[in-house]
Curated annotation (Swiss-Prot):
Its main location: cytoplasm. Pfam families: NadA. It is found in: Cytoplasm. Pathway: Cofactor biosynthesis; NAD(+) biosynthesis; quinolinate from iminoaspartate: step 1/1. GO terms for biological process: 'de novo' NAD biosynthetic process from L-aspartate. The gene is nadA. Gene3D superfamilies: NadA-like. This is Quinolinate synthase. It comes from Photobacterium profundum (strain SS9). GO terms for cellular component: cytosol.
Amino acid sequence: MSLTYDPSETIYPFPQKPVPLSEQEKLTHVEKIKALLKEKDAVLVAHYYTDPEIQALAEETGGFVGDSLEMARFGNQHSAKTLIICGVRFMGESAKILTPEKNVLMPTLEAECSLDLGCPADKFSEFCDAHPDHTVVVYANTSAAVKARADWVVTSSIALEIVEHLDSEGKDIIWGPDRHLGAYIQKNTGAEMLLWQGECVVHDEFSAKALRDMKALYPDAAVLVHPESPASVVALADAVGSTSQLIKAAKELPNTKLIVATDKGIFFKMQQMVPDKELVEAPTAGAGATCRSCAHCPWMAMNGLKAIESALVEGGEKHEIFVDEALRVKSLIPLNRMLNFAAELQLKVKGNA
């Protein structure tokens, strides 16, 4: 299936890296952030892929570190009036969709996601309109507008079960936006699926050849892979799953050395769970200066201490997430379909990334 618009051929301009802070500057920002969180009745909610110092601060101040859906759920259930979402834009939108009555702020609204950027709502809607007999299933790593166009919103932890269910009902499926995850699901379910050709700039860079070479160096190591990675990389995995599932696998596998093919931001929480195990970054297609993301999302890196402080001090249009109410209500329908399906199966739904 070819697309007139092929996001897999797009080269995304990466944001500039934040200016490094001195240790004294870090301490000053941390103390100010702690005071502002109390003053503003706010809580820090951080994704696994943010920098370790951000995750540590979230935990230290009574906030939360988790995957995208867990973040939105935590914000929904916490008593704070203001949520500081440290992640990428769709995560802030997800929090607002589930908790419209709260102020949802982000360190920067320019923290994008290549899966979201690669799936513009207008182009995706045209694709769906061209196949009106297909059920539209989208990954949670999408904008509110794309979610609103879908029949189902899924996370990687339950995508297989939902697609199997739809396939058993004889449904043909449009899947978006991640082509690698879509191909993984298609292979494991045998479902008829039209795949949107988006990709995560981090996971797309992992190299099967380099991973095989690394495995030869560490034959006793287990390989943990996120399913947004290319099929050739997934084929080498001892465990495949979302961020939360990979952390769980790290605990359960007997291996003392783990090669991890996902954003290296996950090492902070994973190492907490397995302090006696050695974690090794899986190799990317490039090495050193020749890789682009180098196993760390450039937009996640924008969630720095200075930016968090600015969000708490300034708020407003530079930091606050707004979702059109009609769009919010419409996007809740496919999201609730997933949650209700999970409840019937008594599955605990985890997020994606």
